[in-house]
Regions:
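Generic hydrophobic alpha-helical scaffold/packing signal
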Residues: 98, 132-133, 164, 168
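Short, contiguous acidic/charged loop-to-helix segments that flank catalytic cores in large enzymes
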Residues: 114-122, 151-158
Length: 185
């Protein structure tokens, strides 16, 4: 799908009013860094405790635990280094955005986009969860329409394959319909 430009989305909101829902997932980088520093500090204490225990009395179990917690600590330190890079982009980072349209019997996930370098935060999945909860479950709507997919789906290298797999990750299924069109008014 191609980006249709800001004017299109303004007209869309004007046409659909309160039935159109724009959702944005943001990373509050200061909070993220503080949380990761706290987790890193807890992991560092665990590693130090396990290392002392292993040095005093080496066992296979303690060695395994030490290895696992050391890997967790390294991962936390890596995330903190990445976060320091992200912080250069600002204090609040828009990671993904989506447009949903509510109808009486379904909610349609119409458009979305995400910032590639923030994909490890799974912002698109967070938006989906939030939309399913607030636009479907809370309203008693039983159909959540992931809308369009395109591509060659039996080719793992097709660009559309990732979109299909993302949507199937929510237990979705393919319902083949006639497609989309623009009706001039």
């Amino acid at each position: 799908f191609e980006y249709r430009g800001e004017a299109y989305f303004r007209k869309f909101k004007q046409a659909y009013g309160s039935k159109a829902h724009f959702m944005v997932a943001q990373i509050h980088i200061g909070e993220y860094i503080a949380d990761m520093e706290s987790k890193r500090d807890v992991l560092r204490k665990k590693v130090d405790t396990l290392q002392a225990k292993y040095d005093e009395h080496p066992t296979t179990k303690t060695g395994r635990q030490l290895g696992e917690e050391s890997r967790n600590l390294a991962a936390a330190e890596k995330r903190l280094a990445e976060a320091a890079e992200y912080a250069k982009d600002g204090d609040v980072l828009p990671a993904a955005a989506s447009l949903f349209v509510e109808h009486a019997r379904e909610t349609v996930y119409l458009f979305s986009g995400s910032v590639e370098k923030y994909k490890p935060f799974y912002a698109s999945a967070l938006i989906q969860h939030d939309a399913m909860l607030h636009l479907c479950v809370e309203r008693g709507v039983t159909r959540y329409n992931f809308y369009g997919i395109d591509g060659v789906f039996d080719d793992p290298n097709s660009e559309g394959r990732g979109v299909l797999e993302f949507k199937q990750g929510f237990n979705g299924y393919v319902d083949e319909l006639m497609g989309s069109f623009v009706l001039p008014v």
